């Protein structure tokens, strides 16, 4: 392969690596949003439980107690779904990281080859 062809291949590989970098950044942002939402749900649930306990100590109706428990169960379901979402985002992020690493190694190998040919 002549040097012009090699430089073209390097340029294309760099573009591929740059695209992988952008995808990785997007994947990290998506994971962070999912993680933040999970933490927000967990905080809200904790605050709601504390508030519900305080209200229960002051005395509330059976209906209000039932609705409070139902709401906490709904929050549990939301938290479980969000945990699954975070796990899926983490797996996607791992895949994007591997793709970026592969692209970066390929560029590095091509650049080493170019150095040997110059």
Where are each of the predicted segments found?
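Charge-rich amphipathic alpha-helical interaction elements
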Residues: 1-118
């Amino acid at each position: 392969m002549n040097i012009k062809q090699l430089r073209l291949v390097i340029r294309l590989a760099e573009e591929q690596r740059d695209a992988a970098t952008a995808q990785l950044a997007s994947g990290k942002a998506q994971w962070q949003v999912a993680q933040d939402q999970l933490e927000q749900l967990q905080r809200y649930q904790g605050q709601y439980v504390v508030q519900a306990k305080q209200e229960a100590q002051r005395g509330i109706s059976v209906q209000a107690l039932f609705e409070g428990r139902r709401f906490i169960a709904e929050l549990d379901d939301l938290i479980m779904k969000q945990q699954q979402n975070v796990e899926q985002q983490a797996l996607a992020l791992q895949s994007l990281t591997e793709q970026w690493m592969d692209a970066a190694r390929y560029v590095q190998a091509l650049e080493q080859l170019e150095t040997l040919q110059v």
